[in-house]
Structure formats: C-alpha cells, structure tokens
Amino acid sequence: MVFFWRKSDVEKKAEKGDKNAILELIKQGKKEKAEKILKKYASQREDLAELLFELYVQEGKLVQAYPLLKKYGDKIGKAKERAKVYQAVGEYQKAIEEFLKVGDFESLYNVAKIYHQLEKPDKALEYAQRAEKLVPYEKKEELENFITQLKKELGLIEEKKESILDKLRRGLQKTKEAVEFGVLFRGRKVDEEFFEELEEMLVKADVGVKTAVELTEKLRKEAIRKNIKEGEKIKELLKKELKELLKNCQGELKIPEKVGAVLLFVGVNGSGKTTTIGKLAHQLKQKGKKVLLVAGDTFRAAAIEQLEVWAKRAGVDIVKKEEGSDPGAVVYEGMKKAKEEGYEVVLVDTAGRLHTKEPLINELRKIKKVIQKFDKEEPSETLLVIDATTGQNAIQQAKVFKEAVDITGIVVTKLDGSAKGGAVVAICRELKIPIKLVGVGEGIDDLQPFDADAYVEALLE
C-alpha cells in the first residue's frame, strides 16, 4: 500500500511566493522548507529577500545572509542585523558604519571590538569608553576588563608579558580542575592506594592506558628502591619521567628563508586547521613575512569563507575558488602566484573528510605532487592539526593521514577547552612525530611553540 504525502494549502500558497503563507510556515517551525522557498524568490522579490535575510540572521547563518546584503544593501534588514553580517564576513568598515547608525551599548561595544581586531587599540578605546556610558550592570565587569586590556596595549598601563608557561597554565586549567594532581601529591602518604589513584588520574587526563600503567609501575619501583614516603617527591619523579618521554617530541617550525616555502595543513574537519592557519599567518606577518593563504578545502563553502575572514584579519592575501573546485587546481594557482609575486610563506588548507578515506588520501597526495612541480623540496612542513578535546580518537585519525602524506609535525589545538590535556603525552608516544605548536586559547597570540618542560610543569602544578 503506497501513501502519498499531501501538501497543505499553506505549503501550496507558500510555494507560489505568498509571503503570509511563508510566514505561517516559519511560525509552524518549518523553517527549512520556508528557507528553500525563499531562496527561489529572493533574487526577484525584495520583500522575500528581506524575509530570508531576517531568517538567516535569526538562525545565526550570517555568512549565508551576505549575498542578499550585497545585492540589496540597506533596503533589507535593520542596521544592527546588517552590521553583524558585515562583521561575520570581514567587511569591517561597513559593519562599523551600520553599528554607529544604532549607537546603543551593544553596537558601540562591537565597534570597539572590531577596531581591536583591526589592531587599532586607540580607536577601540575611544568607542569602549563611549559604550561605558551606556553599559548595563551585567556587562560592566566585562567592559572594564576590555578597557584595561586596551590601556595595557597602548602602554597606558604597564603590562607583565605572559610567558609560555603562564599560557600553558591557563590552557591546561580544565585538565587540572578535572584531574587535581596537586591534591594527590600534597601531604599524601605513599602507599598502594596512592599509586592506584595516580594511575586513575593519568588515565583520566588521557595520557593513554598503556603509558599510565607503565609510568605508575616505574614510580612504584623507584619509591621502593629509594624508600620514598612523600607524595611531593613522587611528583618530582613523575615530572622527570614525563619530560624524558616528551623530549624527542619537541620541534621547531621549519620555514626556510626563500620564496615559496610551503606549510601544508591536514586534519579532520573541526580540528582547528583554518583557525591555526589564520593565527600563524598573523604571527608571520608580524615578523615581516609576505604570506599567502591557499583555500584548498573546496568541499565546504564555510571553510573557504572562514579562511577569507582570517586573511582579512591577518592582513594577508588569499587564493580561492568556488565550492566544489578541484583542490589541486587551487593549489597550482596559489603556488604560481607565490613564485611570480615573491610570497615567502604559503599556508595551504586542505579538506578533512575522514569518512571518505581513499579519496582523501589520493587528494592529499595529488596536492603534494602539485606543490613539488614548483619546488621538489616543498612542502617544508606537513602539519597534522589535532583537536585535544578528542583525546585518544585523535591518534586513530592521525594514522589515516600518515598513510596519505609524510607528517613532519603536529599542532595540538583547543588545549584550553579540554580536560584531556594529557593527550599530548599519548600523541607523542604513539605517533613519534614532533609537536611543533599548541593552541592554548582563543586569542590571536595563543598559538605557541610547544615547550615540553613548560607543559609538564603546567600539567602537574
């Protein structure tokens, strides 16, 4: 018996472009259906384009709203909505203009944050202080902290520079809160129960079961041999063992002084690849390098758009094509531009569709061949980006990418968002690939070289 789904009268009217019927669909929660219909009419009808624009903004789909804004300008949406869309795609000057038309606290605060992003702390401070006059109570502390930060950047308040150790301390805070090594070591008698708890904590921190068992057994034997009775002394021994284990997993980023040094980034979608590329581009630009980004992940429009936003933020150039383009062709164009126009560093983004293993491996190998057509010694680095929050799963993912290309270094991201900070130990031990960089926060300067000693100190504090 076959059942046919009958469309309601509302749906039939909506499909003919009836605005009230489309609004009724949205009211009924059928937003996807409404969106599909609105897309069909948006290029011809301004009233439906405005409705689609508002729907996108409500759903947080700001990037998708941008083409409508580009076509209709200030004929659609409210100033604050338009500002948020411009901000999302990196059209910062237009975003500022729209926010200033509103002039409320939120808008002025957003203007201040945009100027800060554009590295204009003086303008950021001007608008933050204007926002201060309108600040609601619940935002007062946040704004005060932001103003203090701006004053430090402008040299109006002396600031103590945050060291790598301080950044790692901050980044590993969630792991320390979840695992509490300090509580175990402080004032505890060293007995069998102590070692059982230590092993559990190491497993919880995600150093890997095998590593946790081996480390605990080694410390147990050492405690018997040296007649150690205090937890603090075991802590020092554990630090020594972890530093020894990690010493071969520390490596500097290799960027030769020449035109067209390539850093190829691989990793699963969502690992933080694009953000890592953006932050590194910013840091290299600050050092005076001429940097080019290549949007080689052509399977996701969002990846291309995100990299474009980072290029604007870092003040560097980008080579990109539309979604669905051949990644090899994009990389070819990027390499050609780099050689012809003298770009010193080329940062290449790639797709990370792990569920399609064979096509992914073939695609990465093809990209590498394209790079080597221009320079047989490149890429200088092939960096695997791993999300610390995925813990042990990251190791399984890494093995797939190792099949495709020679990985020369690892970037561990989102250490600040994970209670699995010990995964760095497991990654080092299992993969035996140097960890070149770690992401310890959302700030543009929170991508840091990996320092094994500082990492161990921060983890066990």
Curated annotation (Swiss-Prot):
Q: What SUPFAM superfamilies does this protein map onto?
A: Domain of the SRP/SRP receptor G-proteins, P-loop containing nucleoside triphosphate hydrolases, TPR-like
Q: Name one GO molecular function term.
A: signal recognition particle binding
GO BP annotations of the record are: protein targeting; SRP-dependent cotranslational protein targeting to membrane
Q: How does it sit in the membrane?
A: Peripheral membrane protein
Q: Write out the residues that bind GTP.
A: 267-274, 349-353, 413-416
Q: What does this protein do?
A: Involved in targeting and insertion of nascent membrane proteins into the cytoplasmic membrane. Acts as a receptor for the complex formed by the signal recognition particle (SRP) and the ribosome-nascent chain (RNC).
Q: What is this protein called?
A: Signal recognition particle receptor FtsY
Record organism: Aquifex aeolicus (strain VF5)
Show the taxonomic lineage: Bacteria, Pseudomonadati, Aquificota, Aquificia, Aquificales
